[in-house]
Amino acid sequence: LSILASTISSYAGEEIEDLIDIAESKSKIIAIIEGRKTISFELRPKEKVLWSGSKGYLGAFLTDQRFFVISTSSTAWQVLPLRINEPEKGVASLSPYIALLVTGDRAIGFDAASNRFIETQLPIHDELLAAEAEKYVAVVITSSRAFGLAKETSAFSEIHLRVRESIEAIKITSSKATVRTSDRLLTFEVTGSTWNEHRLY
C-alpha cells in the first residue's frame, strides 16, 4: 500500500508571530513570554529533553519522562507525566494554537485557549500513518481510525474505517484535514469540529 501524505501550510491571513521563546539551561526549561515574563521549571536529575518547539501562542518540551506545554496566558508550565517507553515512541507537532503528542496508545492535544491537555486512546496494534498539528486543527490517522482536534474544542473527534477500507491519501491544511480512502472522502474542518464522510462509489 502506498500512502501519499502531504502536509500543506495554507494559513489564511497574516502569519501569527511567535510570542514565546524557549530554552533549556542548567537542568531547567525556560519560557520567555512576549519578551517580558519568564517562567522556568526544574527538571529531575537525569531527565533528558528529546524535543522542543515554540510557535505562535505555544511553547513545548518533550522529555524522557514528561510533556511540558506553556501558552501566552499561562502562569506556569503545564505538565503531563508519561509512562515508561512512551517518550521514545512519541511523535510531537506544534502549531500556533495546538500542541500534539502521539505515543504508542494515546494522542494528547493541548489547546492554547483552554490551557489544558486533551487525551484520547488509540487502537492497540494500529499503524500510525500521520500525526500533525496545523494552524487550527490537529489530526492523527491510524490504520483503522482518524482523529481530529480543532482549536477551542474539548475533545478529539473520531471516525472508524470500515473492514477492508484502506487509506490512499492524506492532506492537512491550516483549518482542514482531508483523508481519501478506497471507499470514501473524509473531511475534518475547524468550523464543524466533526468528521464528514462522502461516498466515492
Segments predicted by a language model, with ranges:
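Repeated scaffold domains used in trafficking and secretory/extracellular systems
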Residues: Y11-I20, R44-Y57, L82-Y97, P123-Y136, ...
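Structural motif
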Residues: S27-I30, Q65-S71, D105-D111, S144-A150, ...
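A short beta-strand motif characteristic of beta-propeller blades
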Residues: R36-L43, E47, A76-L82, R116-L122, ...
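Blade-level signature of beta-propeller repeat domains, shared across WD40, Kelch, NHL, RCC1
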Residues: R180-Y201
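Bacterial N-terminal signal peptides
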Residues: L1-S6
